[in-house]
Amino acid sequence: IGRPSLCELGARTLTTLPSGALRTSDAQGRPLSVFSGCGVMAEYATLDTRSLIKIAGDAPLRSAALVGCGVMTGFCAVTNTARVAPGAVVVVLGAGGVGLSAIQGAAVAGARMVVAVDIDDFKLGLAKTLGATHTVNSKGDDAIVKTLRKLTGGGADYAFECVGSGELAATACSVL
């Protein structure tokens, strides 16, 4: 817990060649070390055009910046990776930024039932406004899998763990 192994692996393999040489360089050919594959702490970055979206010039950058990570992670996990089908039953574990975006993705995909699960009633309220058809506060629910299986009529077609918890990942698998 607390060790993003895939991120650490990516940081080691996406920017550094096996020889230890760096993949990127500046205009003068000097090697550049980058973080997260594209220099996220840099003022400028070189990216593939497929990774870019145009935003309105008057869009607040504090809000627009969220779209590139949390929003796209949750939304695209549902629409691009899982390809949730219309009429599906979806369970989203965690109603933070990534989870709320997954809920929106499920609603846009046409899911028949979108169940948001969290321990915070405020977040669950937000989930309802963003497309959740049902909410479950799992705080103190030792039988959450049973609760979700009953609510979904036997299990979900898709389940998304949006917290980063091994225990919740197991729960996600168990509600399918």
Q: Which residues are covered by each model-predicted region?
A:
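A glycine-/small-residue-rich N-terminal strand-loop-strand element
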Residues: 1-2, 54-60
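Glycine-rich phosphate/adenylate-binding loop and adjacent beta-alpha elements
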Residues: 1-51
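A glycine-rich, Thr/Ser-enriched phosphate-binding loop motif common to dinucleotide/cofactor-binding enzymes
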Residues: 26-41, 59-80, 93-101
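Short helix-loop-beta connector
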Residues: 58-61, 83-89, 154-155
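Adenosine-nucleotide cofactor-binding segment
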Residues: 92-95, 105-171
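Helix-to-beta-strand junctions that scaffold the AdoMet/dcAdoMet cofactor pocket
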Residues: 176
